[in-house]
Amino acid sequence: VTVMDLPQQLAMLKQNIAGKPGCDRIDTYPGNLLDPGTGIPGGFDVVWMSQFLDCFSEEQVVSILQRVSATLKPGASVFIMETLWDRQKYDTASFDLAQTSVYFTAMANGNSKMFYSEDLFGMIRKSGLGVVEIIDGLGFGHSLIKCGK
């Protein structure tokens, strides 16, 4: 397993896993995904992105996904875990996610929003990837999107 994140996040990861079973199987790769010049390591069978694309603008999401797509070996998959407000089982959950978007936009970085699924799927397609499968209802309202070239 290789984890890519900001150096300070990787330092916390290393502290948290030190001495735990399997810690020797976790590698780290520091980088700022918001910098279009940041390379992304390749050669993996699976790339997992969990609950962070919703923090960025469409342009930033497409840039990240394009760079991931460029590193994929044949047959590799990209899995994206997000809370998609229009794919919730209950209307109240959709409403709550929409209000979370308002909170994050106003209080965080001005970009954060919970995705409308077709908007995210459009960004995925724009990056050169395609949606292969969608699994809804994971955990508390999460969707897992399997992507490939």
Regions found by a protein language model. Give the residues of each.
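Alpha-helical subdomain
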Residues: V1-K149
